[in-house]
Amino acid sequence: MSRLFSDVLPEWPLDEVEAGLASVTETDVLVALELAENGRRLNARDFMALVSPAASPYLEMMARIARDVTVRQFGRSIQLFTPLYLANYCTNQCVYCGFNTKNHIHRSMLTMDEVEAEGKVIAATGLRNILLLTGDAPKLTGPAYIAEAARRLRPYFPSIGVEVYSMSEDDYRMLVDAGVDSFTMFQETYNEELYLKLHPAGPKRDFRFRLNAPDRAARAGMRSVNVGALLGLDQWRRDAFYTGLHADWIQATYPGVDIAVSAPRMRPHEGSFNDIHPASERDLVQYIQALRLYLPAAGITLSTRERPFLRDRLIGLGITKISAGVSTAVGGHAHAAQDAAEEHDTAQFEIADDRDVDQMIAAIEAQGYQPVCKSWEPLDEAYACGKSA
């Protein structure tokens, strides 16, 4: 059987990565920046230099190069999407997540008619990219349930993504056959010892099975594969480095797949987990710019976990995809008028940017960029953000 990313990760032991980050010199950073500016391919050591403490004084130079690289690869366009939470039942005990099975929150699961109602509300905003999410409760929201939801939504959305629990390759293939074309999986942290502490019980505790999920999704025919770590669980520079390695592995191993990276930071949630390794906004900027220089063709997604000012400023510095009109509550689009207390009681985490689609479009245009509401065919409509009747 061919290699998986779980075969690659041990080649970069945690202590060696930590030592490598600490030993980066100013010269190492400048060499990496010169390579990027000249359009040369960066290797893993160059990427390590760019996420190291030694690169922090060079953010302005990184920003200039990252802006140029992004425009060359993607033009002046930003893709828009929104999440649709199908259910928040979960059997895991992730200590940092609002869906933790021990948390006393209101649990719910959409019927197929409710799924379609949510889809209609979202489609009316003009968005044609949607991301389906659930907790990890396969007995309730199994692959067949998610596939049926995708089939119900397919008439409204040319591009449907999933961010759900780890599945088998056959299950991912079932989703592809139902119309799902993109896949997102956060490893949360690449520090296996810490990962096991953060996931004391539940199927998600299987570090290796989750780690290899992007490989299985790519083999199953997903058009786009998105990986990421949740910054704040471990030292951010280590997880940033491993995320870049993971994305590069998928890109090199499955050349027909579009690779993307998300860069979420910890946000307040239901529960008591507070053992956070903070990543500042400046840290996030460094990470995103380093990703752009290391992986010029990769999409980079920024979520509503970040405040509006920062999201707007990052539009020109490497970001290619951004969420809008977000609700992290089950049924949160069709029932947006319900009171804030009920929304808070079912949400996975608190969002920092609550702008709707029209406001996000205006913000993107104010930065001199074109909002893109449809990413796939037909090509002649791909750059329109028109609303449906």
Regions found by a protein language model. Name each.
Residues 39, 66, 94, 132, ...:
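Conserved, mostly hydrophobic/aromatic
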Residues 168-177, 234-248, 307-317:
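Catalytic cores of alpha/beta
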Residues 47, 51, 82-84, 131-143, ...:
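Glycine-rich, proline-tolerant flexible connector loops at the mouths of alpha/beta enzymes
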Residues 82, 119, 146-150, 172, ...:
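Generic structural signal for well-ordered alpha-helices
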Residues 101-217, 223-227, 231-233, 255-262:
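Core AdoMet radical
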Residues 75-114:
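Canonical Radical SAM [4Fe-4S] cluster-binding loop centered on the CxxxCxxC motif
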Residues 1-55, 252-389:
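Auxiliary Fe-S-binding modules of radical SAM enzymes
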